[in-house]
Amino acid sequence: MSVTLHWFLPTYGDSRHIVGGGHGIPAGAAHSDRDASIDYLASIVRSAETFGFTGALIPTGAWCEDAFITAALLARETTSLAFLVAFRPGLVSPTLSAQMAATFARHAPGRILLNVVVGGEAHEQRAFGDHLEKDARYQRADEFLDVVRRLWAGETVTHRGEHVDVESASLALPPTPVPPLYFGGSSAAAGPVAARHADVYLTWGEPPEAVRKKIDWIRSLGEEQGRKLRFGIRLHTISRDTSEEAWAQAGRLIAALDEDTVRNAQAGLARSQSEGQRRMLALHEANRANGSWTDAHSLEIAPNLWAGVGLVRGGAGTALVGSHTEVADRIADYAAIGIDEFIFSGYPHLEELYWFGEGVVPILRKRGLFGAAADLAAPASIPFVGSAR
């Protein structure tokens, strides 16, 4: 099999240190040394395209720049790279969201992927004018995505639901091909919505056995819907010529953190409503409690899987750390349990992309795990009649 590789765009700024912020941490908490200018982000996406990456994830939230506008500006900077645009269903109407994606798809064919983010932080949702509780946000996402899918299929849609109400909605130019939907969520409410609508189910970087259980869960729900999903994982990476060099870099990243910074970040993350965030915190809970987090190796929770990033960063909090061969081995391990797509990042994002692209990618190619033939996810079949983490 051949895996699909994506990179990540730090639209909140970049640094040689771990940049905090993200899920559960207030806007403005991230401290970066490099401005997230279009010129800087363009240097990252052009490099990702050179190394053969399929796409680049652009995050959403109060702590970063708007993903759709960023993607539109960067599309002219590349020729083939796709943009995995994170968006929150319900902050704008499904008709407008469907139209925005269709317009992007028409002007940059095959180069928009959509990452559905239901939202795990009630306080952040309220800042955007959204006062629904978590389970209700999943119910709304279910209705929302049903309308979007039907609009993309060329239907004229009237939908009067509990959360979505549109009348005689249609698109003048439905997209061809239809943008694939990426969807993550670890709570009981998330699974059925992902099974009905997602083309790719995303998980953060937990140990392989935990990831396998998630895959089995979502796969079984998809089979009940008559659908077959692909699976993706979100990880950071520290890859070097030797394992010792990689772990030394991990040590440098956490050496720059102090106890107060970690404590404040963890307090914010602990308030998160996200089940995925709770699972991320649990990965290094014991090490934080006994103070051993200052030793990089103490945060190795599975072979070459390091939980140090999650000390101060919300969301994806783990990294593959090791020699280029070791990182390639771990990618192969995840692929063997069913992971099709990988979304990577590192600090700083441009330099770490080069370490990965020049060190790991050639090994993956040699093993037949990665190549130019790796295609975008083909949208899974969707029942358009009838109808969040």
Task: Describe the role of every protein-language-model region.
Residues 10-12, 61, 86-90, 117-121, ...:
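Active-site beta-loop-alpha junctions enriched in small/polar residues
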Residues 3-9, 55-58, 82-87, 112-116, ...:
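Hydrophobic faces of well-ordered beta-strands that scaffold small-molecule active sites
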Residues 31-47, 183-193, 320-335:
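Short, acidic/polar
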Residues 91-106:
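Glycine-rich anion/phosphate-binding loops
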Residues 56-67, 90-95, 207-213, 239, ...:
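Acidic-and-aromatic substrate-binding clefts and catalytic sites of carbohydrate-active enzymes
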Residues 2-22, 29, 128, 134-175, ...:
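An alpha-helical appendage that flanks or caps ligand/catalytic pockets
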Residues 1-80, 176-179, 385-387:
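N-terminal beta1-alpha1-beta2 module of alpha/beta enzyme domains
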Residues 48, 52, 74, 104, ...:
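Conserved, mostly hydrophobic/aromatic
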